Amino acid sequence: MKLINLVPVFFVLIIVVDYCHSLPFFLLSLIPSAISAIKKIGKRSVESQRYVDLNRRDLEQDLQELQDFLDQISEH
């Protein structure tokens, strides 16, 4: 076989070996982002924060006063 016929095979082997060599490093770089994504699953989103977080902003009492006021109005 002539050497010129082996050049495409040689280039394909270089590409395959380079890809296989860099794949573990690519997967290792994905681990921190996957961990942070898993940690964010249990956290509340910003959109629901203002509705869920009444106790922290001390709005529970205001909500109760509003509910009492609405009850008084509905009685009349």
Swiss-Prot record:
Signal peptide: 1-22
Modified residues (Isoleucine amide): 41
Keyword annotations of the record: Amidation, Antibiotic, Antimicrobial, Cleavage on pair of basic residues, Cytolysis, Fungicide, Membrane, Secreted, Signal, Target cell membrane, Target membrane
Propeptide: 42-76
Subcellular location: Secreted; Target cell membrane
Domain of life: Eukaryota
Expression sites (tissue/organ): Expressed by the venom gland.
Biological-process GO terms, alphabetical: defense response to bacterium; defense response to fungus; killing of cells of another organism
Entry's Gene Ontology cellular component terms: extracellular region; membrane; other organism cell membrane
Family designation: Belongs to the non-disulfide-bridged peptide (NDBP) superfamily. Short antimicrobial peptide (group 4) family.
Function: Antimicrobial peptide with potent activity against Gram-positive bacteria S.aureus (MIC=2.5 uM) and S.agalactiaea (MIC=2.5 uM), and Gram-negative bacteria E.coli (MIC=24 uM) and P.aeruginosa (MIC=2.5 uM), as well as against yeasts Candida albicans (MIC=6.25 uM) and C.glabrata (MIC>50 uM). Also elicits high hemolysis on human erythrocytes (HC(50)=9.2 uM).
Protein name, UniProt field: VpAmp1.0
Organism annotation: Mesomexovis punctatus
